Amino acid sequence: MASTTPPDAPTASRALPDWIAAVVTFLSSGAVLVLEVVGLRLIAPYVGITLQTNTAIIGFALAAIAIGAWAGGAAADRTDPRRLIAPLLVAGGALVVAVLPLVRFAGELLTGAAAGNVLLLAAVAVVVPAALLSAVPPMVVALQLGSLAETGSVVGRLSGIGTLGGIVATFATGFLLVAVLPSSVILVGTGILVVLVGLALAVLLRRSAPGVTARLPVGLLVLAVAMPLLAAVAPTPCERETSYHCARVVADPERDSGRVLVLDTLRHSYVDLADPTYLEFEYVQAIASVTDATAPAGAPLSALHVGGGGATLPRYLAEVRPGTVSRVLEVDPGVVEVDEQELGLRTSPELEVSVGDARVALGSEPAGARDLVVGDAFGGLSVPWQLTTSEALELVDRTLADDGVYAVNLIDHPPLDFVRAELATLRSVFPEVLLLARAPVLAGEDGGNVVAVASRRPLPADSIAAAMADRGLAWQVAAGEELTAFVGDAGVLTDDFAPVDQLLTPYASAAG
């Protein structure tokens, strides 16, 4: 007898309960976005946070989503999805956990912001687990389709649920989880949750369709157990993970009271716990020399510090210029905690620390209130571009008194395009600009830290050079025609166009 069942009749016996289909789709999509957000933080200690690292993570995540969705849909046409969904969840969750040790082992070999390092680490961080998990939603869709008449509603509903999962995961991770949990905990927790859901689904499917679904391969179960163990023994660059950095404090073996603040892979600050007048880094000595030459000896200053680090200069000024009032703008509350707990920082009415974005805080500074603004927010791998532009420098200028001075630490390496562009930008705002650097840097043969000095008033170049010499600092001062030749045809950075990540030539071992 011919069948009377129409070809598009519902196949409800294959379908998952709607709520289970929704949970699986929501979770698999959300886990991919957690991986994307946390993946950027995982690779940052090795290659920095730049436009390139953001682009690489986002690009590889999108590629993995596309590949996974295509492959998952194709596989669902050839194989009963009930055989594949649970193994994919278990494998994908285990590999989410595996990302942690894989990035850390690979990062030991790929430190530095070279494009190849960025691309390789980004690929390790997201591609395989994101592709596996992205194969799950199209399989769930195929399983839930009962008839052609339902195609639009089923596909639309599950697509919306998957998108919602990604949105919730993105906001929850970026605004909540990274503020209260280390990246390692977020990643391992997400992976384990996905594995557990996969195991539970495998049990459910074996009970509901024993002749269709197979047992999970033993190797897959071993992988799920082994990955958290591998994550536990992987090398870590972090003594403490802050909102923006891997931070650690290293004792100076040659100076009992010396401490180095290391953020990610770079030495950012040196603090002598017993002697705040001891300045280890040359660029800090150069900025101190600027204050020696531009303000009467011992006279208190009103100073604003854009970037906190170890708060070396605020403590130095408080010691050598009693009565100095300093406000430190630091974006990372974790760095402030390290300063207070391990580097002996004590805040007071004379030394205030404000946590938040410096560009925003500059807008709230009273006009003409500061004798000195120190810029020390730029690292050797990445630059907060919003502090480099002419609009940002106009805020600095507004903050300064008529005879105030802006001294900013910059880091770059040949061809020094970023330094040249920032000097051009400074010259577009301030009538007086100097560059302090070692002779090979001024000749374009070497790189590292340099200090740019800007003001509305004439700057005493000879006095600054003498002050640096008195400290034994072999730096020179470039001014006038020499500075013009150094800047060349570099363009001015603006809020509309500031390609600092492309201009900067990083070098991983530069002291930040």
Q: Language-model segments: which ranges?
A:
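Alpha-helical transmembrane segments of multi-pass membrane proteins
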Residues: 2-240, 251-255, 265-268, 299-300, ...
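Phosphate/oxyanion-binding active-site loops and adjacent basic polyanion-contact surfaces
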Residues: 133-136, 279-283
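Aromatic-acidic/polar surface patches that form glycan- and anion
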Residues: 16, 276-280
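Short secondary-structure boundary/capping elements
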Residues: 2, 35, 241, 279-282, ...
